[in-house]
């Protein structure tokens, strides 16, 4: 493993093949446009290249399709053992992300449990918001729960504010 290189695990990337499996021609077009014939679920891929596929799905097929890809992530990506409650699942999303992406500045997911029925998730992982929301939906669905309704516009605005704050902090750090 080259820790200087940002990489994304094929098992997580493979979620789009599974989620869009009913539309094989769409999957084949996405793969061809990305310059590959297939996604190997056991291989590591360039992080930015992999994330660009998710953006392409959102751009060409739409946000609902990308959310479906995110929901499928729990079936194809590596998740740590012992996630036997919704609270453990949410708290484990950051670790799960680190099992599927590696290298500098790939981000993470931080969960703060507010009480027995609510949590706050901070996603610094790069990628489309709808993918992240789909991952959250798929994770919650494992336990018969559904995340509260958040609009894509709210998530985009929060991400924009977060990136602006990160830039401000970097500018003042010695």
Model-assigned labels for residue ranges:
Residues 123-131:
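Short, well-ordered coil↔helix boundary/capping segments
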């Amino acid at each position: 493993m080259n820790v200087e290189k940002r990489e994304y695990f094929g098992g997580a990337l493979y979620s789009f093949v599974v989620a869009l499996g009913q539309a094989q021609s769409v999957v084949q077009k996405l793969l061809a446009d990305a310059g590959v014939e297939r996604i190997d679920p056991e291989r590591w891929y360039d992080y930015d290249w992999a994330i660009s596929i998710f953006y392409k799905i959102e751009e060409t097929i739409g946000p609902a399709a990308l959310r479906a890809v995110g929901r499928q992530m729990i079936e194809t990506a590596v998740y740590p053992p012992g996630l036997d409650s919704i609270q453990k699942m949410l708290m484990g999303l950051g670790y799960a992300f680190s099992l599927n992406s590696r290298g500098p500045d790939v981000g993470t997911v931080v969960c703060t449990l507010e009480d027995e029925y609510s949590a706050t998730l901070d996603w610094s992982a790069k990628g489309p918001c709808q993918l992240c929301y789909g991952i959250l939906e798929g994770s919650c669905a494992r336990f018969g729960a559904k995340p509260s309704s958040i609009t894509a516009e709210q998530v985009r605005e929060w991400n924009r504010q977060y990136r602006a704050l990160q830039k401000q902090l970097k500018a003042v750090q010695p």
